[in-house]
Design a protein with these regions (language model features):
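Hydrophobic alpha-helical bundle cores within soluble ligand-binding/oligomerization subdomains
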Residues: 1-285
Length: 285
Protein backbone atom coordinates (compact mmCIF):
# COMPACT_ATOMS: atom_id res chain seq x y z
CA UNK A 1 0.00 0.00 0.00
CA UNK A 2 1.41 3.39 -0.96
CA UNK A 3 2.20 6.16 1.52
CA UNK A 4 -0.30 8.37 -0.27
CA UNK A 5 -3.14 5.90 0.27
CA UNK A 6 -2.28 5.70 4.00
CA UNK A 7 -2.44 9.46 4.48
CA UNK A 8 -5.50 10.87 6.16
CA UNK A 9 -6.85 14.35 6.62
CA UNK A 10 -6.85 16.05 10.01
CA UNK A 11 -9.78 18.50 10.14
CA UNK A 12 -8.72 21.84 11.55
CA UNK A 13 -5.10 20.57 11.57
CA UNK A 14 -5.90 18.91 14.90
CA UNK A 15 -2.89 17.00 16.18
CA UNK A 16 -0.61 18.47 13.49
CA UNK A 17 2.56 20.30 14.55
CA UNK A 18 2.87 23.08 11.97
CA UNK A 19 5.47 25.31 13.64
CA UNK A 20 7.62 25.91 16.70
CA UNK A 21 7.41 29.20 18.56
CA UNK A 22 8.65 30.89 21.73
CA UNK A 23 5.94 33.55 21.54
CA UNK A 24 3.00 31.93 23.29
CA UNK A 25 1.59 28.65 24.54
CA UNK A 26 -2.10 27.92 24.94
CA UNK A 27 -2.61 25.23 27.59
CA UNK A 28 -6.24 24.38 26.95
CA UNK A 29 -6.51 21.69 29.62
CA UNK A 30 -5.34 24.01 32.41
CA UNK A 31 -6.89 27.11 30.88
CA UNK A 32 -3.57 28.95 30.91
CA UNK A 33 -1.90 31.25 28.39
CA UNK A 34 1.89 31.70 28.48
CA UNK A 35 3.24 34.69 26.53
CA UNK A 36 6.99 34.76 25.77
CA UNK A 37 7.66 32.64 28.85
CA UNK A 38 5.47 34.70 31.18
CA UNK A 39 2.13 33.70 32.66
CA UNK A 40 -0.71 36.00 31.78
CA UNK A 41 -1.19 37.08 35.39
CA UNK A 42 2.35 38.51 35.32
CA UNK A 43 1.62 40.60 32.25
CA UNK A 44 -1.81 41.83 33.31
CA UNK A 45 -0.27 44.66 35.32
CA UNK A 46 1.74 45.97 32.37
CA UNK A 47 0.86 48.27 29.50
CA UNK A 48 0.19 46.82 26.05
CA UNK A 49 3.39 48.49 24.81
CA UNK A 50 5.43 46.41 27.29
CA UNK A 51 3.91 43.18 25.99
CA UNK A 52 4.57 44.19 22.37
CA UNK A 53 8.23 44.84 23.26
CA UNK A 54 8.38 41.43 24.95
CA UNK A 55 6.92 39.64 21.94
CA UNK A 56 9.09 41.47 19.43
CA UNK A 57 12.23 40.71 21.46
CA UNK A 58 11.24 37.02 21.58
CA UNK A 59 10.69 37.05 17.81
CA UNK A 60 13.98 38.84 17.13
CA UNK A 61 12.25 41.93 15.73
CA UNK A 62 14.20 45.15 16.26
CA UNK A 63 11.51 47.76 15.75
CA UNK A 64 13.29 50.67 17.48
CA UNK A 65 11.17 52.95 19.65
CA UNK A 66 8.17 51.67 21.59
CA UNK A 67 5.02 51.14 19.59
CA UNK A 68 2.53 54.01 19.65
CA UNK A 69 -0.69 54.94 17.90
CA UNK A 70 0.20 56.69 14.65
CA UNK A 71 -1.57 59.18 12.36
CA UNK A 72 -2.97 57.86 9.09
CA UNK A 73 -1.91 58.92 5.59
CA UNK A 74 -4.40 61.09 3.70
CA UNK A 75 -5.09 58.25 1.25
CA UNK A 76 -6.05 55.91 4.09
CA UNK A 77 -8.40 58.48 5.63
CA UNK A 78 -9.99 59.09 2.23
CA UNK A 79 -10.60 55.37 1.78
CA UNK A 80 -12.19 55.14 5.24
CA UNK A 81 -14.39 58.15 4.53
CA UNK A 82 -15.64 56.53 1.31
CA UNK A 83 -16.18 53.20 3.08
CA UNK A 84 -18.19 54.91 5.83
CA UNK A 85 -20.44 56.57 3.26
CA UNK A 86 -21.09 53.14 1.72
CA UNK A 87 -21.59 51.51 5.15
CA UNK A 88 -18.87 48.94 4.53
CA UNK A 89 -18.52 46.24 7.19
CA UNK A 90 -15.98 47.46 9.79
CA UNK A 91 -13.71 44.43 9.35
CA UNK A 92 -13.69 44.96 5.59
CA UNK A 93 -12.87 48.63 6.16
CA UNK A 94 -10.00 47.62 8.46
CA UNK A 95 -8.63 45.20 5.87
CA UNK A 96 -8.93 47.75 3.06
CA UNK A 97 -7.28 50.50 5.11
CA UNK A 98 -4.42 48.24 6.16
CA UNK A 99 -3.79 47.50 2.50
CA UNK A 100 -3.01 51.17 1.84
CA UNK A 101 -0.03 51.13 4.22
CA UNK A 102 3.56 50.44 3.26
CA UNK A 103 6.99 50.53 4.87
CA UNK A 104 10.60 50.13 3.79
CA UNK A 105 11.37 47.14 6.05
CA UNK A 106 9.64 44.39 7.99
CA UNK A 107 10.51 46.06 11.31
CA UNK A 108 9.09 49.37 10.12
CA UNK A 109 5.99 47.61 8.80
CA UNK A 110 5.45 45.92 12.17
CA UNK A 111 5.55 49.25 14.00
CA UNK A 112 3.37 50.92 11.38
CA UNK A 113 0.68 48.24 11.37
CA UNK A 114 0.38 47.94 15.15
CA UNK A 115 0.39 51.72 15.51
CA UNK A 116 -2.11 52.34 12.71
CA UNK A 117 -4.77 49.81 13.70
CA UNK A 118 -6.22 51.73 16.68
CA UNK A 119 -6.29 54.88 14.56
CA UNK A 120 -8.04 53.06 11.71
CA UNK A 121 -10.68 51.53 13.99
CA UNK A 122 -11.35 54.75 15.90
CA UNK A 123 -11.39 56.87 12.73
CA UNK A 124 -13.85 54.55 11.00
CA UNK A 125 -16.14 54.51 14.02
CA UNK A 126 -16.19 58.31 14.11
CA UNK A 127 -16.80 58.59 10.37
CA UNK A 128 -19.78 56.22 10.56
CA UNK A 129 -21.18 58.48 13.29
CA UNK A 130 -20.74 61.57 11.11
CA UNK A 131 -17.79 62.82 13.18
CA UNK A 132 -14.32 63.86 12.07
CA UNK A 133 -11.40 61.51 12.85
CA UNK A 134 -8.95 62.56 15.53
CA UNK A 135 -5.18 62.18 15.34
CA UNK A 136 -3.39 60.41 18.22
CA UNK A 137 -1.79 62.50 20.95
CA UNK A 138 1.89 62.17 21.84
CA UNK A 139 1.15 62.44 25.57
CA UNK A 140 -1.17 59.42 25.72
CA UNK A 141 -0.43 55.71 25.96
CA UNK A 142 -1.51 53.24 23.29
CA UNK A 143 -4.74 52.28 25.07
CA UNK A 144 -5.50 55.85 26.16
CA UNK A 145 -5.01 57.11 22.62
CA UNK A 146 -7.53 54.64 21.24
CA UNK A 147 -10.14 55.73 23.78
CA UNK A 148 -9.43 59.39 23.06
CA UNK A 149 -9.62 58.93 19.27
CA UNK A 150 -12.81 56.87 19.60
CA UNK A 151 -14.72 59.09 22.02
CA UNK A 152 -13.06 62.49 21.64
CA UNK A 153 -12.93 62.77 25.44
CA UNK A 154 -10.12 62.54 27.96
CA UNK A 155 -9.96 58.81 28.79
CA UNK A 156 -10.77 57.75 32.35
CA UNK A 157 -7.80 55.92 33.98
CA UNK A 158 -9.98 52.92 34.87
CA UNK A 159 -11.13 52.56 31.25
CA UNK A 160 -7.50 52.77 30.11
CA UNK A 161 -6.60 50.07 32.64
CA UNK A 162 -9.44 47.88 31.41
CA UNK A 163 -8.47 48.27 27.75
CA UNK A 164 -4.84 47.53 28.62
CA UNK A 165 -5.99 44.34 30.33
CA UNK A 166 -7.89 43.32 27.20
CA UNK A 167 -5.03 44.16 24.81
CA UNK A 168 -2.38 42.31 26.83
CA UNK A 169 -4.65 39.26 27.03
CA UNK A 170 -5.18 39.00 23.27
CA UNK A 171 -1.71 40.19 22.14
CA UNK A 172 -0.65 36.67 21.12
CA UNK A 173 -2.70 33.50 21.18
CA UNK A 174 -0.75 30.67 19.64
CA UNK A 175 -1.21 29.37 16.11
CA UNK A 176 -4.86 30.32 15.69
CA UNK A 177 -6.53 30.62 12.29
CA UNK A 178 -5.56 34.23 11.55
CA UNK A 179 -1.98 33.75 12.76
CA UNK A 180 -1.68 30.60 10.66
CA UNK A 181 -3.02 32.52 7.65
CA UNK A 182 -0.44 35.26 8.15
CA UNK A 183 2.38 32.73 8.46
CA UNK A 184 1.34 30.94 5.28
CA UNK A 185 1.38 34.25 3.39
CA UNK A 186 4.78 35.22 4.82
CA UNK A 187 6.15 31.76 3.93
CA UNK A 188 5.70 32.62 0.25
CA UNK A 189 8.13 35.53 0.61
CA UNK A 190 5.35 38.10 0.71
CA UNK A 191 5.32 41.22 2.91
CA UNK A 192 3.91 42.09 6.34
CA UNK A 193 1.05 44.20 5.01
CA UNK A 194 -0.17 41.39 2.74
CA UNK A 195 0.10 38.90 5.60
CA UNK A 196 -1.89 41.11 7.97
CA UNK A 197 -4.64 41.86 5.46
CA UNK A 198 -5.02 38.12 4.91
CA UNK A 199 -5.08 37.56 8.67
CA UNK A 200 -7.83 40.16 9.08
CA UNK A 201 -9.88 38.27 6.50
CA UNK A 202 -9.53 35.08 8.55
CA UNK A 203 -10.22 36.92 11.81
CA UNK A 204 -13.53 38.20 10.43
CA UNK A 205 -15.01 34.70 10.22
CA UNK A 206 -17.77 33.79 12.72
CA UNK A 207 -15.81 30.69 13.74
CA UNK A 208 -12.82 32.85 14.73
CA UNK A 209 -12.66 36.52 15.73
CA UNK A 210 -16.10 37.18 14.30
CA UNK A 211 -17.74 34.92 16.89
CA UNK A 212 -18.74 37.79 19.26
CA UNK A 213 -20.96 39.25 16.52
CA UNK A 214 -23.51 36.40 16.41
CA UNK A 215 -23.23 36.04 20.19
CA UNK A 216 -24.12 39.71 20.67
CA UNK A 217 -26.95 39.38 18.14
CA UNK A 218 -28.35 36.61 20.32
CA UNK A 219 -27.99 38.75 23.46
CA UNK A 220 -29.85 41.61 21.77
CA UNK A 221 -32.53 39.18 20.58
CA UNK A 222 -33.07 37.97 24.15
CA UNK A 223 -33.24 41.53 25.39
CA UNK A 224 -34.20 40.70 28.97
CA UNK A 225 -32.80 38.01 31.27
CA UNK A 226 -36.31 36.75 31.92
CA UNK A 227 -36.59 35.73 28.24
CA UNK A 228 -33.23 33.92 28.07
CA UNK A 229 -34.42 30.37 28.71
CA UNK A 230 -37.41 30.68 26.36
CA UNK A 231 -35.31 32.05 23.50
CA UNK A 232 -32.51 29.52 23.94
CA UNK A 233 -34.88 26.55 24.16
CA UNK A 234 -36.61 27.72 20.99
CA UNK A 235 -33.27 27.96 19.18
CA UNK A 236 -32.26 24.48 20.30
CA UNK A 237 -35.62 23.09 19.20
CA UNK A 238 -35.00 24.55 15.73
CA UNK A 239 -31.53 22.99 15.67
CA UNK A 240 -29.78 26.36 15.72
CA UNK A 241 -26.28 26.79 17.10
CA UNK A 242 -25.82 28.79 20.31
CA UNK A 243 -22.86 31.13 19.84
CA UNK A 244 -20.57 32.01 22.73
CA UNK A 245 -20.43 28.59 24.38
CA UNK A 246 -17.40 26.30 24.40
CA UNK A 247 -14.00 26.63 22.77
CA UNK A 248 -12.01 24.39 20.45
CA UNK A 249 -8.83 24.69 22.54
CA UNK A 250 -9.79 25.74 26.06
CA UNK A 251 -11.33 22.85 28.01
CA UNK A 252 -11.13 24.36 31.50
CA UNK A 253 -14.36 25.88 32.77
CA UNK A 254 -12.82 29.29 33.50
CA UNK A 255 -9.56 29.87 31.59
CA UNK A 256 -7.25 32.44 33.18
CA UNK A 257 -7.37 34.72 30.14
CA UNK A 258 -11.18 34.75 30.16
CA UNK A 259 -11.22 35.59 33.88
CA UNK A 260 -8.82 38.47 33.20
CA UNK A 261 -11.02 39.74 30.40
CA UNK A 262 -14.17 39.47 32.50
CA UNK A 263 -12.52 41.33 35.38
CA UNK A 264 -11.26 44.11 33.09
CA UNK A 265 -14.63 44.48 31.40
CA UNK A 266 -16.52 44.53 34.70
CA UNK A 267 -14.34 47.31 36.10
CA UNK A 268 -14.59 49.31 32.89
CA UNK A 269 -18.38 48.89 32.78
CA UNK A 270 -18.69 50.00 36.41
CA UNK A 271 -16.59 53.07 35.65
CA UNK A 272 -18.70 53.96 32.62
CA UNK A 273 -21.92 53.57 34.57
CA UNK A 274 -20.57 55.72 37.41
CA UNK A 275 -19.29 58.38 35.02
CA UNK A 276 -22.50 58.56 32.96
CA UNK A 277 -24.61 58.84 36.11
CA UNK A 278 -22.79 62.05 36.97
CA UNK A 279 -23.35 63.64 33.55
CA UNK A 280 -26.38 65.98 33.38
CA UNK A 281 -29.10 64.49 31.17
CA UNK A 282 -28.96 67.35 28.68
CA UNK A 283 -25.30 66.49 27.95
CA UNK A 284 -25.99 62.83 27.23
CA UNK A 285 -26.55 61.62 23.72
Amino acid sequence: MSTQSQARANPGLEGIVAAETALSLVDGERGELIVAGHELRELAQHDFEDVVDLLWDAAGVRAGARVAATPLPAATLALLDDAARRRVDPMDALRMAAGTLSAASDAAAARLLVGAFPTIVASYARLTRGEQPLAPRADLSFAANFLFMYTGAEPHPELVRGLNGYLTTVADHGLNASTFTARVIMSTGSDFVSAITGAVGALKGPLHGGAPGPALDMVFEIGDAARAETVLRAKLARGERLMGFGHRVYKARAPTCWRRLRHACSRAAATRASTSSRVPSKQRR
